[in-house]
Regions:
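Short alpha-helical elements
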Residues: 1-234
Length: 234
């Protein structure tokens, strides 16, 4: 039984460190070990997410007041850089912890993407190439009928609002392509998606191999339409 915030932090650290020891060989980086270990940094990020500390300035400010739990709190620039470098590991650990907490057992989810523009369209020709180096490019956002330069954040979210998985992809990457890769890592779910995820082949593969049912809102010209009570889910 976890009765306090301190106990929750300890439990989270033990879980994160156990998982990290198993997967850390996949994320080796050059240089000396940091004063704040990767396990500590990942734990601070996960606990901060649980507490709703959405901004890094708020998260780090709170941890600086709790140096009894984490004595070495990195600067914001260093924390941000290391957190981005560990993004894949963070997501793997996050999914494992969610399963341990049994918070993701709803079984019904929604998949969608949202645009993350990084440079205004008309300013792209004169901008530096830094964003392009990190994967940003041009892509269309059909729902808003616009073109952006940047990324799309693809999310798998429980109907209760819990983020189960995410992928930050170039703006040009199709929802169906990224969604297929993301859903292939999950099983035993019913997933609702918009028209961007329509694919009979993908739906069949996920059902056969992952026991995952992908339900999409049909296009108006499709013969098979959803019943009204199910359409309201979208």
């Amino acid at each position: 039984m976890i009765d306090s915030f301190d106990e929750f932090c300890l439990w989270m650290y033990v879980m994160v460190d156990d998982i990290w020891q198993q997967i850390s060989p996949l994320f080796q980086r050059p240089g000396p070990a940091a004063a704040c270990s990767d396990s500590e940094l990942l734990t601070m990020a996960l606990v901060g997410e649980c507490r709703g500390w959405a901004e890094e300035t708020v998260l780090l400010s709170n941890w600086r007041e709790r140096r009894d739990l984490f004595p070495c709190v990195p600067s914001q620039s260093r924390f941000n850089r290391r957190r981005r470098a560990l993004m894949t590991a963070f997501n793997l650990i996050r999914q494992t912890v969610l399963r341990l907490l049994d918070l993701s057992a709803d079984g019904q989810c929604a998949i969608d993407s949202l645009p993350v523009p990084v440079v205004k369209f008309h300013l792209v020709p004169g901008s530096t190439g830094d964003w392009a180096t990190h994967g940003a490019d041009f892509g269309k956002v059909a729902s808003k009928k616009l073109t952006i330069f940047g990324f799309k954040l693809h999310l798998l979210v429980s109907l209760g609002g819990l983020i189960l998985d995410f992928v930050l992809a170039p703006a040009s990457a199709a929802d169906l392509t990224v969604g297929a890769e993301m859903l292939a890592e999950h099983t035993d779910l019913t997933v609702f998606g918009d028209k961007g995820y329509i694919s009979v082949d993908l739906a069949g593969q996920l059902l056969r191999h992952n026991r995952l049912k992908l339900l999409t809102l049909p296009r108006r010209n499709q013969h098979c339409q959803l019943p009204p009570e199910l359409s309201h889910t979208f």
